């Protein structure tokens, strides 16, 4: 960098040479990301620099000014040369990227183009629907409307002019050419709908059988009674986190209070935070518990690649991991009870084929708003029915990524954590299953966590959960076909686990209720039966709500919201199926930091008071302590009532207008059930499109 005096002179001369024109600073960035040249050309900075230059001229004399002018001209030439070199380098880099694009860049660009393509398709569909509605309204007011079952072509004497003739020609065209492909597609979607409904019914019957026979994994005797001689195995506890300042404290606190001999377990806080202030806060929390005698270490990666999988993979590469037999994983918002290890670890005893013990999630904010209530319905069914049934009858299910205990040997023999997808939990579960390891699910062991309270956070979470599996399917398919497991297990993995529950469900849900149904309103010759629109979906929603009976009043909002979410899930499924850019994205779900107990804030405040200043000074540096104080002051000065803004979702709004348009058309045909379904579904899309469901984003 140039000396301060030289920089002042350059700015002053540069401003004079340009006639005092105001502008914005010009930043020339070279190929090295750590080197940049900033040329000041802004109104405020220029005035300050001119004042400084005048002051220097008054104190330096004429001779010194001449020598300084020569140096200034030299620096001006150097700056211009560097700027030209930077532009040349940028041009060369852009040209190189154009001819040497990485697959990820190409996929990302394709993903953005696909998103625009889908939105364009919805807009085009909406425009055609509005045009068709205008035609139908004109026909209705002129008395040309023909009822669906009795469609016929009028005789020549009945035609009342060229407009009526054109309308009759349109009716004949749609009956002869448009009706057949719509009927074929609708029948295919109805078939998929029936298959998926049967799968859900079988799962519910399996859950009923488990409840009736009281089937569940059990521990023989009480291994922790006095005099039992139980040898506590070595357990590693991992807490991966990334910029989650709202929840880090309570998750670390809960892990440190696990009821297990302290010499027999170690806690790894795997911090991938990019915010240095959050890193300091987490370090201080780790230091506090370490001072209290807990075996806890703080790990931070310099190269944060691979998202959560890369974080876990890096932690498992430590030399001391070989001394541990099991690893328990908790995300940053999870709060295990003190007896968690005592309820899970004994299941491994005498069961060498057992690779995973998965606990159930419980939600501290399930009653916070309508969005969290609807999520609770979905996840209660997932754990109570899907995970429990698959665990009892198949000894296999998708690992939920947290609140589970792995046998480290199972992880290592299955290839460990891989960074190839954003669903590393499902990836390792499939590979472990192919290697012959068994899983059990403990429905009565619950770990507290949070649900996303804003639609934006929930939408991003669902996108990752539905794009990752389809991407993983292509990666695992060769291994599934060549694995040394039974044919029915291969069929279960391919047909049920991946295709039916990860691909078919979002496909038919979006296509049937958001495309075909409104389309049949304008092509009444291809009508959908009422049982597909109303009766079967209501029955399936009733089955979904059975595991959470208190949510029964929300059965209708749940049905409508699930159809609304089909847009996001279909979008994610397509991106994962074709390996587009958005299937590689990992966005940490926003947390609110809600506690599980009403007095948790009091307990945290009490612990904070115990963390005295001298104790902190022994464990973190003085500069870090100053940063912590400044961070606390900024939090205290922050406004309490931050203004929140609603985000507009264009796809949902466009689909809302489309469905409301189709509802208007169904009203002309006196289709009662079709009209009410389209009306309520359109209003549901409208609420979501205007971000009126859940907590608004800051």
Swiss-Prot record:
Enzyme Commission designation: 2.4.1.-
InterPro entries, per the entry: Glyco_trans_2-like (IPR001173), Nucleotide-diphossugar_trans (IPR029044)
Membrane-crossing segments per the record: 124-144, 190-210, 503-523, 528-548, 653-668, 673-693
Sample GO molecular function, one term: glycosyltransferase activity
UniProt keyword Acetylation present: no
One annotated GO biological process: cell wall organization
KW Chloroplast (keyword) present: no
Membrane-topology descriptor: Multi-pass membrane protein
Ligand binding (substrate): 331, 333
Chain coiled-coil ranges: none
Main location: Golgi
SUPFAM superfamilies assigned: Nucleotide-diphospho-sugar transferases (SSF53448)
Superkingdom per UniProt: Eukaryota
Locations listed in the record: Golgi apparatus membrane
GO cellular component terms, semicolon-separated: Golgi membrane
Keyword annotations: Cell wall biogenesis/degradation, Glycosyltransferase, Golgi apparatus, Membrane, Transferase, Transmembrane, Transmembrane helix
Enzyme class name: transferase
Active site location: 272, 425
Family recorded in the similarity comment: Belongs to the glycosyltransferase 2 family. Plant cellulose synthase-like C subfamily.
Known role: Probable beta-1,4-glucan synthase rather involved in the synthesis of the xyloglucan backbone than cellulose. Seems to work simultaneously with xyloglucan 6-xylosyltransferase. Xyloglucan is a noncellulosic polysaccharides of plant cell wall and consists of a glucan backbone substituted by xylose, galactose and fucose.
UniProt name for this protein: Probable xyloglucan glycosyltransferase 2
Gene: CSLC2
